[in-house]
């Protein structure tokens, strides 16, 4: 490879990082500083985002998108297959680690849960525009449902019932945003302007607030106490999962913005939500927090290269 080719590639990656990732980390830095200097409680900010802003975002994106039922169905199928692949890869990788049950639950949880909300949605918008955001939102919705069903089942390791996990779906506000959007589209009845304007304002606030929550969560990270286990989980999440996602996206038939957004979302670092589940069910919370922090901090190296690939091959 010629030196000029290497220089061009480096310039491309730097340009992608500056335009698509640096804004996210700049806003996350603000959240980190707020949590570190004036003690803003992440739980309060997270709940405002989760219960008020995220449903408005999902509603606004879906009613203004051109997604049809087939496209949405393919994205949900893609998410299901990606999650299954992540689970199987994590289960195999855990064998030589000889983990106890709580540690195994934590290990599976961090590998199957990607940060498709706080991190994935803003990056999808910056890298692939409104079309990419629409598909990324479908992935985010599916992952939100999983967090309160499969995620809880994994974390609980049999201590909670299936019924309790299913009831948890009702606690996902984004579901109501999606249902309202579906009803509006089905009936061909858009919201009156007096209602749509506040929804749009809340929607516009969602992505910046999600990133601030991400930064506040990073401020709580501690030094890993199980480096081999942490390293294995991080490699699975941000190195091997992108490769698996590319293959699965082709198998499902995703194309264009759907392919870009789907692969990007599946390749995000570990979801912040896993720290909440780990604390709730006492499954290696320090390990989970370490994986969230390290995978997020290293993700610009992998996500930048991935975006360059997706922009050239979709």
Residues covered by each model-derived region:
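Alpha-helical transmembrane segments of multi-pass small-molecule/ion transporters
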Residues: 1-314
């Amino acid at each position: 490879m010629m030196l000029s080719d290497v220089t061009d590639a480096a310039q491309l990656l730097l340009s992608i990082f500056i335009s698509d990732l640096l804004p996210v980390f700049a806003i996350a830095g603000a959240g980190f500083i707020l949590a570190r200097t004036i003690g803003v409680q992440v739980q309060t900010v997270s709940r405002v985002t989760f219960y008020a802003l995220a449903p408005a975002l999902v509603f606004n994106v879906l009613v203004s998108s051109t997604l049809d039922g087939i496209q949405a169905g393919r994205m949900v199928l893609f998410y299901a297959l990606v999650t299954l692949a992540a689970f199987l890869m994590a289960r195999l990788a855990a064998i030589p680690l000889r983990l106890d049950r709580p540690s195994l639950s934590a290990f599976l949880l961090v590998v199957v849960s990607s940060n498709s909300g706080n991190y994935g949605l803003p990056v999808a918008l910056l890298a692939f525009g409104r079309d990419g955001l629409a598909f990324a939102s479908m992935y985010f919705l599916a992952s939100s449902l999983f967090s309160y069903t499969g995620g809880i089942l994994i974390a609980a390791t049999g201590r909670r019932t299936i019924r309790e996990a299913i009831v948890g779906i009702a606690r996902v506000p984004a579901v109501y945003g999606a249902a309202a959007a579906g009803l509006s589209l089905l009936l061909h009845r858009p919201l009156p302007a007096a209602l749509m304007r506040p929804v749009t304002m809340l929607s516009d606030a969602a992505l910046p607030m999600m990133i601030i929550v991400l930064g506040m969560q990073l401020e709580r990270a501690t030094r890993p106490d199980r480096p081999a286990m942490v390293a294995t989980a991080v490699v699975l999440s941000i190195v091997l999962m992108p490769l698996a996602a590319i293959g699965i996206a082709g198998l499902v038939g995703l194309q264009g913005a759907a392919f870009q957004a789907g692969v990007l979302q599946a390749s995000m670092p570990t979801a912040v939500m896993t720290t909440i589940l780990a604390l709730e069910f006492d499954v290696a919370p320090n390990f989970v927090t370490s994986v969230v922090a390290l995978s997020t901090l290293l993700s610009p190296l992998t996500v930048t290269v991935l975006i360059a690939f997706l922009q050239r091959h979709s």
